[in-house]
Amino acid sequence: MRFPFFASFIVFCIWLGYEIHKHRNKQAKVDQEFWQTEAAANNTRRKSLDDLEYIKIPFDSLPMNLLKEDSEIADYHHTLIELSNSPIVNFTGISNTDLKLQYGAPNIELLSRYDQSYTTLVRTLQDWAEVLFEKGYTNEACSILEF
């Protein structure tokens, strides 16, 4: 009775050791590929940013005159006006490594600022639409969110 249990335990330990070893090898390969790609990205020269899809804020299609005396909405307007003076690009879903490979490592700070501007734009539009919705301006809130 003890021998089958002991033998099963030994087989289980050997199998577990094999699986752990296999997982470590697989993870080491993934890590190595990541660092090779990262090294290649860090050595990429600066490339042109002309093909980026810059976002322009369409002030004429946004309800800029609605409740503009409200201080909270005035803050959103001010943020949007400031954002309109800076480049805005949506890099959602694109890793920094991919950005460095495509546009060059020296551009990563600039591209990060463009993406941060996009994040600020989206957050501001969401907050502005929420305030309008709460005040009963459903259609105007929808037009903001549809942008």
What do these predicted ranges mean?
Residues T119-Q126, T138-N139:
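Generic helix N-cap/helix-start motif at coil->alpha-helix transitions
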Residues R2-V122:
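N-terminal alpha-helical interaction modules that lie
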Residues V131-L132:
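Residue at a conserved register position within TPR or TPR-like alpha-solenoid repeats
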Residues Y114, D127-W128:
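Residues at structural and domain junctions
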